UniProtKB/Swiss-Prot annotation:
InterPro entries: SelO (IPR003846). Belongs to the SELO family. ATP binds at G81, G83, R84, K103, D115, G116, R166, R173, D254. It comes from the Bacteria. Mg(2+) binds at N245, D254. This is Protein nucleotidyltransferase YdiU. The lineage of its organism: Bacteria, Pseudomonadati, Pseudomonadota, Gammaproteobacteria, Alteromonadales.
Amino acid sequence: MKFKQDFFTQLPEFYAQVYPQGISNPHWLAWSEDVAKLIDLQQPTDALLQGLSGNAAVEGASYYAQVYSGHQFGGYTPRLGDGRSIILGEALGPQGAWDVALKGGGPTPYSRHGDGRAVMRSAVREFLVSEALHHLGVPTTRALAVIGSDMPVWRESQETAAITVRLARSHIRFGHFEFFCHSERGQADKLTQLLNFTLKQHYPHLSCDLAGYKAWFLQVVQDTAKLIAHWQAIGFAHGVMNTDNMSILGDSFDFGPFAFLDTFQEDFICNHSDPEGRYAFGQQPGIGLWNLQRLAQALTPVIPSDDLIAALNQYQHALVQHYLMLMRAKLGLAERADSTAEQDQQDLELIGRFTVLMEKNQLDYSNTWRRFGQLDPSSAHSSLRDDFIDLNEFDAWYQAYQTRLGKVTDIEAWQQARNSVNPKYILRNYLAQEAIIAVEEGNLAPLERLHQVLRQPFAEQVEHEDLAKRPPDWGQGLIMSCSS
């Protein structure tokens, strides 16, 4: 790997230098060829294994943990930072630079009495979800590899340490700006310094002045809205939408007790530590705005409040428009040129009626959408009908749907288009759990198989049909712990 060290050299007060502590008996558990190409890596070598496991130095790496704060479950925590993630620097590749981080690389000054380690199950889950979301077309950080060990660590019980090698376009979070506004009061110069760095690195078309800052914040609002529209359309619950887990670039970031929906449930909670459902699936759009408001609050020393409010007021429109675009594609509805607010509302109601039907009839979210690939939209009798209990309610919806759809001339092309946006394969929690159990037993084949299938989520892959089925009773709607 070839590195540049812009964050390390230009923002010395934004991190602590810390070196990883190696794990014993490191070995590859997973490797992504797709991600390796992003930073010009060819294959997983033993020398690379030693470097990424913290047992040897990586040439050109600087090793540091960033400091930030954040709102966690609505309350402000003044000092967080990378408690177990150590960044090597920005690795250069054909499509630009990527931060390379060792998640689980050992304790840092921000570990807050933690051991700085990640357990194998959480490392595997982060690897799988990073790659699954990417191949579904959802903005996300990436995962190069999972490195296992025989090092014991203790959570609810004894587990084994592992490292996820994460790649990110940037590790700058909402919480970085919060730290230098709230926790380090009177540090407006640091906010400006961080803003200028962010613009030069990721928004070079914007000027480092008030006009540029205003345009940048509006872009953050729009990117965040688009990200959450993706989550809602694909049926993804993040689980821990704290402001320190929000990427400034609108990428899915810092995965813990996430879940893809099995049976559609608007109020689904995937996080065992969230009994009140603050971060439930249906709450994510509102939390996205709440988090942006916290970011705006942190930016008031450098951007006037009126300008911040004006940008925040664009959030709902951006969210709805992107959500409509994604959902119209899932349903096969033509995009309306210059659609009116009334027409958009009609489409939202049509979509909402269908998801309510899915919830009332306890239908699998992804599999139901996939069925549109076999639907003859010109037929008065829908092949979906047998999935529903309340046939009168479904028939009323289907009639409204056909009216909005209009005439379809090439049914086969229409069906293929539905299969290109409605995935057959998603990372169901029970599939991840089965792969983790197999790894614990020394069998990497299920993990590799699942990884490869998730690289082509829209393809039929008939030899892997079992991975597209609804989960068994034990695997339905699994709720995960935050411990990792």
